[in-house]
Structures are given as structure tokens and as C-alpha cells.
From Swiss-Prot:
Sequence positions bearing Phosphoserine: S351
EC nos: 1.2.1.36
A Pfam family per the record: Aldedh
Protein name, per record: Retinal dehydrogenase 2
Species the sequence originates in: Homo sapiens (Human)
Chain's role: Catalyzes the NAD-dependent oxidation of aldehyde substrates, such as all-trans-retinal and all-trans-13,14-dihydroretinal, to their corresponding carboxylic acids, all-trans-retinoate and all-trans-13,14-dihydroretinoate, respectively. Retinoate signaling is critical for the transcriptional control of many genes, for instance it is crucial for initiation of meiosis in both male and female. Recognizes retinal as substrate, both in its free form and when bound to cellular retinol-binding protein.
Quaternary context: Homotetramer.
A biological process term (GO) from this entry: cell population proliferation
Length: 518
């Protein structure tokens, strides 16, 4: 094959002096943030749980309690489903609303998120531990773009006429499915909230959504904005609670027509089983990953090192897309490892509210312990620990940026999703070899390849068993493009036009006519 060079975006290198000089231009966290919304949101009203139970919410940077939130269980889910079914009933305000008006409401919601962007970013940092500037510029930007993207789609979803045989007039309608149950994770609480509700509302559905018990605060705040935007009562209902109670009630509820879940593969299996046992509700699952990132010797090495670093360590490594299996061609392996270790050692770990922080804490003690246990397994199985590997001796759940070399495919750290700041670097010799090894996984969410040869890039991308493949980039997610997994990384697609298919049913209508004319 003839080599054809691919143009890559230039690497951005931060000037520390320039950064410090420009800090006054950056957005600031909201000081003394008041947590106003801690109750269940049903029918546009704030309510206590039927049981009267509450649960604590923590700041992972300190381990200290922030507040208590009402704990929803099956009784509360029943109330929410009843409200959502009423809002979806024929002749309701929501069902009779013009599609363009649904779009206007989503646009209004985006406006309100923009207005309260600093408050919401502060909440994501306080409750989730992510750096404030990441929350402000990445998470909140994604939320706003998602709402605006689907606002534009609302009055552009339509069927078609079909020239069937005989004296008939046949057309299709794209109708909302009904009441959608949605369960979202703790790693991107607000972004996943938007990913779930925006396409559902765009298509005219109603929603019962459960945020993760670790991070309910931003979702509850959105309840106030939803009401302010003018959504009718019962259209969106927000219920904080635990998976085995509130989550299980959503998955098995016969009054829910569709369920969408983002989280672990293990829980995804349980949800699909519950959906089948109850009313065979429609299911969309966005699950775990163990994504390969393939670096060829002809790649721009500095650029590839930085992209691979961000692809693993972004969001404290708490990404389903994390490129944790980094396959590096043998001739550049040692140099790639050396530069990756240097970069990991420069990574700034600290308070989420410090503008120089790149990495905050893990979400909770359970995840912290799981990550450290997997790191120890890597050492025990013979991988070389190049740097990191320990928790930091401070309050909160901080872990050092960790890099392993000499990793082999049979090690636990090469097979299991770590969901933490741990980079595993493997070596390969040939393209055929690396394709086979990269695909040798139960997961198939994303993959990436770095090379200046377009033929290599397209050969690898077409061979990868993954829902998304990035060439000379990583984590390039957009509201306009579909996202979802192969194999045990899930089913269905979110985002883009394809995301609308998950929230609509196609109905065929045929009319007998006296005479058909072409």
C-alpha cells in the first residue's frame, strides 16, 4: 500500500506563565454554594419520599457530607410513572403541543443552563470531584449543545408515503414510545442527564429518571430549570435513590415503555433481564469498555503521547471510553513509555476548585479501593509499575496517576475495566497482530489509531469491533454523531439522528381508496 499522510491538529502546549497571567479571565466557582433542591421531583412539585427516608451525599475531595437527599423507592416510582402516564395521555397538553413548541422548550432549557452554568459546574465539582474548569468547559458545554441539537430536531421527525400495490394510500408515522425510564451514572451526571432526556423529549415522550445515588444534586437542580422553562407537569420526573430499589423498580415497571441505562455491564444485564420479564420494554444500554488505543511508529509521537494520556486520565480515568489498553509499535515502545511516564508525573492532582488542577478525587471509597486492588494485581502479575500506584495521603479519594509497562493481554489490568487513573502500555509488532489482540475483548465501545498512513488508519478502523473509532484523536464526542457499543458494551445508539430512533415507534397507516393514480 502507498502511504498517504494524514493532517493532524497541532498540539497545544500550555505556557505556565501565560496560564497564571490569564487566571483572572477564567470562570470562577460559585462561592458558598447553597444546595436548594434535595427532594423528589414529581409532576413539577418537590415531594418527600413515601418512606420518609433520606440518604447522605458526599464531597469526594474531602469525604465530608454535603447534605441529605430524599430517597425514592418503588412507591415513589409508582407515583412518578402515574404522573408521566397522565402527561402522555391522549389529549394532554404535552401530546397536543406542536413539535416546534417542544423544540422551543428545549432551547429555553438550554438558555437556563447557560444562565446558571457556573452554579451547575460548581455543583458537579462539589458532588462529583471533577475539576471545575472541566465541568464548566466540557460537561456544561456538552449539556447545552445537546439540548440545542435536539431542539432543532423536534419538528423535523416525520414519516413518508409508500407506493404499495393496489388501491391503497399508505404512510408512516414516527410516534413517541411513551413513558421512558432512564438511569444515569455518576461520572458525568449532568451530561448524561442531557443525553437521556433531550432525545426523549424531542420525540414527545415523558420521562422518569433516576440519577446515581452518589451524584443527585445537579439532576435535582435541573428540576427547577425544567419547571421554569415551562414543561408541563409530569413530563419529566426526577427521583434520586439506590439501584436495587428505585432502579430495579424502573426496570421492572409495567407502566414504563422504554428504559435507557448508562453504567456497568453487570447492571446492564440485570436491567435487560428485568425489562424482558416485565413488559418487554424497549432497552438502550451504554455500558463498560476496555478500549484499545493503537499507536504506530509513524505517528507524531509527542501528539500521540498527549492524546493517549488524556484518553486515559481525563475525568480521573472515570470514563467508559477510557483508552486504557495502549498498544504501541515495538520500535517506539521504550520512548513512548518514557514520555508517557514524564507526562503522568507532571499531572497536577489537587482540589477540584484549583484552576491548575488536572485530576481530582475518585468518586468514593468503594471505587478508590477497587482501583488500588487492581493496581496491586498488576504488580503481582508481573507488569512494571513505572510511576504512581498509591493513594495520596490526604483527605478524600485521590490516587496517583499510574503507568504500567510490560503489560500482557492475560493480566487483569489488561482485561478488566479499572475506571481510574491507570495507564497500561502494551507492545506489538504487526498490524494483523494488533488488530486481533485489540478485538480480543468482551467489550467494544470505542477504539483509536494514531498513524500518518491513511491506509493503515482505514484498515484498522474498519477492522475494529467497536461502535466508535477515532483516528488521530481521542474522546472526540459530539451531539451530532451517534455513540454506542458493540458486544458487551451495550446496544442501541445515543446522540445524533440515530439517537431519535431509540425514542420513537414507526407506525404504518394504510387507507383503502377508490382508485389509485400515479
Amino acid at each position: 500500500m502507498t502511504s498517504s499522510k494524514i493532517e493532524m491538529p497541532g498540539e497545544v502546549k500550555a505556557d505556565p506563565a501565560a496560564l497564571m497571567a490569564s487566571l483572572h479571565l477564567l470562570p470562577s466557582p460559585t462561592p458558598n454554594l447553597e444546595i436548594k433542591y434535595t427532594k423528589i421531583f414529581i409532576n413539577n412539585e418537590w415531594q418527600n419520599s413515601e418512606s420518609g427516608r433520606v440518604f447522605p451525599v458526599y464531597n469526594p475531595a474531602t469525604g465530608e457530607q454535603v447534605c441529605e437527599v430524599q430517597e425514592a423507592d418503588k412507591a415513589d416510582i409508582d407515583k412518578a410513572v402515574q404522573a408521566a402516564r397522565l402527561a402522555f395521555s391522549l389529549g394532554s397538553v404535552w401530546r397536543r403541543m406542536d413539535a416546534s413548541e417542544r423544540g422551543r422548550l428545549l432551547d429555553k432549557l438550554a438558555d437556563l443552563v447557560e444562565r446558571d452554568r457556573a452554579v451547575l459546574a460548581t455543583m458537579e465539582s462539589l458532588n462529583g470531584g471533577k475539576p471545575f474548569l472541566q465541568a464548566f468547559y466540557v460537561d456544561l458545554q456538552g449539556v447545552i449543545k445537546t439540548f440545542r441539537y435536539y431542539a432543532g430536531w423536534a419538528d423535523k421527525i416525520h414519516g413518508m408515503t409508500i407506493p404499495v400495490d393496489g388501491d391503497y394510500f399508505t404512510f408512516t408515522r414516527h410516534e413517541p414510545i411513551g413513558v421512558c425510564g432512564q438511569i444515569i451514572p455518576w461520572n458525568f451526571p449532568l451530561l448524561m442527564f442531557a443525553w437521556k432526556i433531550a432525545p426523549a423529549l424531542c420525540c414527545g415522550n415523558t420521562v422518569v429518571i433516576k440519577p446515581a445515588e452518589q451524584t443527585p444534586l445537579s439532576a435535582l437542580y435541573m428540576g427547577a430549570l425544567i419547571k421554569e422553562a415551562g414543561f408541563p407537569p409530569g413530563v419529566i420526573n426526577i427521583l434520586p435513590g439506590y439501584g436495587p430499589t428505585a432502579g430495579a423498580a424502573i426496570a421492572s415497571h409495567i407502566g414504563i415503555d422504554k428504559i435507557a441505562f448508562t453504567g456497568s455491564t453487570e447492571v446492564g444485564k440485570l436491567i435487560q433481564e428485568a425489562a424482558g420479564r416485565s413488559n418487554l420494554k424497549r432497552v438502550t444500554l451504554e455500558l463498560g469498555g476496555k478500549s484499545p488505543n493503537i499507536i504506530f511508529a509513524d505517528a507524531d509521537l509527542d501528539y500521540a503521547v498527549e492524546q493517549a494520556h488524556q484518553g486515559v486520565f481525563f475525568n480521573q480515568g472515570q470514563c467508559c471510553t477510557a483508552g486504557s489498553r495502549i498498544f504501541v509499535e515495538e520500535s517506539i515502545y521504550e520512548e513512548f513509555v518514557r514520555r508517557s511516564v514524564e507526562r503522568a508525573k507532571r499531572r497536577v492532582v489537587g482540589s477540584p476548585f484549583d484552576p491548575t488542577t488536572e485530576q481530582g478525587p475518585q468518586i468514593d471509597k468503594k471505587q478508590y479501593n477497587k482501583i488500588l486492588e487492581l493496581i496491586q494485581s498488576g504488580v503481582a502479575e508481573g507488569a512494571k509499575l513505572e510511576c504512581g500506584g498509591k493513594g495520596l495521603g490526604r483527605k478524600g479519594f485521590f490516587i496517583e496517576p499510574t503507568v504500567f509497562s510490560n503489560v500482557t493481554d492475560d493480566m487483569r489490568i489488561a482485561k478488566e475495566e479499572i475506571f481510574g487513573p491507570v495507564q497500561e502500555i502494551l507492545r506489538f509488532k504487526t498490524m494483523d497482530e494488533v488488530i486481533e489482540r485489540a478485538n480480543n475483548s468482551d467489550f467494544g465501545l470505542v477504539a483509536a489509531v494514531f498513524t500518518n498512513d491513511i491506509n493503515k488508519a482505514l484498515t484498522v478502523s474498519s477492522a475494529m469491533q467497536a461502535g466508535t473509532v477515532w483516528i488521530n484523536c481521542y474522546n472526540a464526542l459530539n451531539a451530532q454523531s451517534p455513540f454506542g457499543g458493540f458486544k458487551m458494551s451495550g446496544n442501541g445508539r445515543e446522540m445524533g439522528e440515530f439517537g431519535l430512533r431509540e425514542y420513537s415507534e414507526v407506525k404504518t397507516v394504510t387507507v383503502k381508496i377508490p382508485q389509485k393514480n400515479s
